[in-house]
Amino acid sequence: MTVFRSSETASSSDSLREALRLAASALKAHGPPFALAGSYALWVHGGPEPVHDVDFAVAESDVDAATATLETAGFTITRPPEDWLFKAGLDSVFVDVLHAINDVPVDAELIRSGESHEVLAIRMHVLSPTLVLTQKLCALHEHSCDFAKLLPAVRAVRERVDWEQVRANTATNDFAVAFFALTDRLGITSAPK
């Protein structure tokens, strides 16, 4: 089956992949330890390919080392007002380097929790779909609650997720609970008995 994509999307995907490859290669060679996170982690596990940015996680204590490594590799470093990440720019694309997720500092244990996968010919830790979806659902709130963006990824990785764990870890977020009501009705997930 032939899939047609606009040249803009193909170009964006190529640029994101190149940024992912270059950042991972630099971090793997010069440290600090890292893990692929966010939508690209879901992509490794079978989700749709992201079109906006690449997410890596580094321990909060390793931010300066990660900044130095990526800057030396040719990335332009910017620090947005959010105090839980920095951005490493390469041409027109960004690698978001997260050192806290949902107000929880990233630590070495989280990085090590990722399974080792070969991603674009580079072996790296990749966060599990259970963890990534937990993080994405915990981040939902009244100003950021686009279920349509989550549904394709959830549908694609549903057999690789410990849904009981995700439900337990997101039970205090009303938007996550509402998301599960939708996915249960759509047959993507099953309500606990």
Predicted regions mapped to residue ranges:
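Compositionally biased terminal segments of proteins
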Residues: 1-193
